[in-house]
Amino acid sequence: MSETITYQYTSPSLLDKTKDQEELFLSRFSEVQKNEAPCFFWGRLTDPYITGRCLVTLSNVVQSSFNLSPFQLALLKDPIVTAGNEKIRFEGFSHCCSVYARVDVLPGGYDGEFPASGTTNVDFNQPMISALSGIGRNEQVMLSVGKKEVALQKQGSGKIVERKVPLPVKWIKGLTTVQLYMAASEKVFTFNRMQALQLFQSIPAGKPKADYHLVMRGNKPSFSPVSTIDSICVGGVHRLKLMEPLLPLATQLKVFPHPDMQSTTWQLYFGNTCFSLSLSRDCWRGFSGEGAALESLIEDVPDQWIDAVDKYSYANQVFNPALLSLEEGIQLERVDNITARLAAMGLLGYDADENHFFYRRLPFKLSRILSLNPRLKDAEKLLEEGKVNILSRSADKVEAVVAGTDVVHTVMLEGEKERCTCMWFSRNQGERGACKHILAVKKKLIS
């Protein structure tokens, strides 16, 4: 499978500078967008200096990598922008997909209107980053997001034209996975600015391979190579340095660990702007390679339900499962499965601070997203070839065998515990999602 999806912008992105203002126009692309709305947002940023610094930091994340070659690093990738429901969100991944970043401009962070809502892709090359870096504290800056234009208005001159860029396949996979990890995470720590600065000063130099742990010593947080009972495990702790330039500007830092420590989310607050950074468990294991979404993709969801979500939802809208159940006549007990399924398909993002999903339609066909899970495809192939046999089944235990290559694997499901005799399960112990044999057995049980 190709590692990138190449697409054609209808027009280039550019920064148009005149004597009295600057206008930033960002192009967009979508395989699925129904309405060609010319503008998603137009208005004035109330704190453009903070917004500009957050977007520059997000760009640094997008241009970073913690396990790729110099050749791969030369390929710039583009953030995704969602505007609607009185919020503007910019999000992106590092090249290796082990770091996910998002900038949320919330109500009060702008003075403007949302003529329509939607999701678009924009390219942040160096000229654009330089323009964002040049925003001063007292400047009046106008912003618009749409099909043909996003405008930053300030003093200056000249024009910057951006090129189209390919969007990596693993970005799409990462977007579907990171939301499920964030949804399972809960806030554990809230630090003020001084505590946040103290914490980041304890990040070891270099690129430590060993795990570090966020521990509290009295009122002072720090990173330690030794874990304690209530500590938070962070692999690849040096990745947090990406958000270090924002610390002196932030008022608060909140930490949201995954219950199994498979990810951590770090959120900085600047009044009406929020910057989020999520780290995968290890540098070499990005969100795109995780199996968190696989369980949600086992059970098929009728196309009419997906169409129903698309019908009443709009960009950044809070996803209300109860409303979906009521309006479409779906049994309430199935709504949780539908929510997880929609998140796994990229239709939902997650706001850890407000503890809810929000609708965000990725600009790609659902069939493409669903085709990006090789383990699930392998499980379906095992079923098609008749290689799955259920030996016994009771209320709390299932035993099955799955024919492999020159070997037969045994699968045991006992309550929430599941085991398989294959090498994948032996190596990962379920930390990276179920193996194809367990997926095949589960899919057969519900078919």
Language-model features and meaning:
Residues 1-447:
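Long, low-complexity, compositionally biased intrinsically disordered regions
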